[in-house]
Design a protein with these regions (language model features):
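N-terminal capping/small domains of soluble enzymes
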Residues: 1-98, 104-105, 281
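Hydrophobic faces of well-ordered beta-strands that scaffold small-molecule active sites
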Residues: 19-23, 42-46, 98-102, 126-128, ...
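Glycine/Thr-rich beta-alpha phosphate-binding loop at enzyme active sites
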Residues: 69, 133-147, 179-240, 280
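Glycine-rich phosphate-binding active-site loops on the catalytic face of alpha/beta enzymes
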Residues: 46-51, 125-132, 190-200, 247-248, ...
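Generic structural signal for well-ordered alpha-helices
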Residues: 32, 80, 84-88, 110-115, ...
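C-terminal helical cap(s) of enzyme catalytic domains, especially alpha/beta-barrels
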Residues: 38, 56-66, 202-216, 258, ...
């Protein structure tokens, strides 16, 4: 392992290497403990937590495409109280370096969520999900507005002064570097690029949308070139350190992200079919 995979820091948080599990596919983190040695990874980003429990979207939630995966999960989660009391301590006890993904439907819930996070002794790093495309409120509707990105990031920085603040950005805008600048102005220590692209599919040969919400988030190899472009542009702008997420399916993909200027990489959808990939990337870098 060379210096690209060795220990590094994002703001006040130290990580053992540059290979993370992305938010979403790994659930609360411990679901993959029997398949992945979580202690070997730089970090494990939890599924997104909201202040109140969410049941998620009704109907079908996952749909495979020829080069990726559409999801309409809808931020299903147990809510802040159970997460900070049960799920997060269990992940920390496993030896994983936890990065907590925080989301919100509105400003009041977001402030309450930050207060709950501030009371937890286990929150050293957070990734603000300002970019989920498959919810009615919050998510991408916040993250596509630079002024709101700055406001939400600044609030997190003030509420969690001893934690690393990472803003996860949406690619569904004209210029993602504008969002990176807004996150930096709000005090973010880094940005994650990217979240899913908006897409849809029709069932069979008919005209019936696969998902009840019609549109969903596309991940997997199909979005790798888009993610690589976003990482390249943010890195070249010098605005913020950037964590790469989107379409990694091989060691080669991870190396390309690092060559494009990423400080770390997140593996997500690929672990559904290849849970050994994150550790192989750790070994190869």
């Amino acid at each position: 392992m060379n210096a690209r995979a060795d220990a590094f820091t994002i703001g006040p948080a130290a990580f053992r290497n540059r290979v993370f599990l992305a938010s979403g596919p790994a659930g609360y983190g411990t679901e993959y403990a029997g398949l992945i040695n979580l202690e070997r990874l730089g970090g494990v980003v939890t599924k997104t937590i909201t202040f109140r429990p969410r049941a998620g979207n009704p109907g079908r939630r996952l749909w495979e495409t020829e080069a990726g995966l559409l999801n309409s999960i809808g931020l299903e989660n147990v809510g802040a109280a159970r997460f900070f009391a049960e799920k997060l301590p269990r992940l920390v006890e496993s030896g994983a370096r936890a990065v907590v993904s925080l989301g919100a439907e509105d400003w009041d819930d977001y402030r309450s969520l930050l207060d709950a996070a501030a009371r937890s002794p286990d929150v050293d790093a957070v990734e603000l999900n300002l970019s989920c495309p498959n919810v009615d409120r919050g998510g991408m509707s916040i993250g596509s507005d630079p002024s709101l990105v700055e406001r939400y990031v600044r609030s997190a920085r003030e509420a969690l002064p001893r934690s690393a603040i990472i803003a996860k950005l949406t690619p569904n805008v004209a210029d993602i570097t504008v969002l990176a600048r807004a996150a930096a102005d709000g005090g973010a220590h880094a940005a994650t690029a990217i979240n899913t692209l908006v897409g849809m599919d029709l069932a069979g040969d008919g005209a019936e949308p696969v998902f009840r919400r019609v549109r969903a988030g596309l991940s997997g190899p199909a979005i790798f070139p888009v993610a690589l472009d976003a990482v390249w542009r943010i890195a070249k702008s010098g605005t913020l350190p950037v964590v790469a997420s989107g379409g990694i399916a091989s060691v080669r993909d991870a190396r390309k992200f690092l060559a494009a200027g990423a400080v770390a990489v997140e593996i997500g959808t690929a672990i559904f079919r290849d849970p050994g990939l994150p550790e192989r990337i750790v070994d190869a870098l």
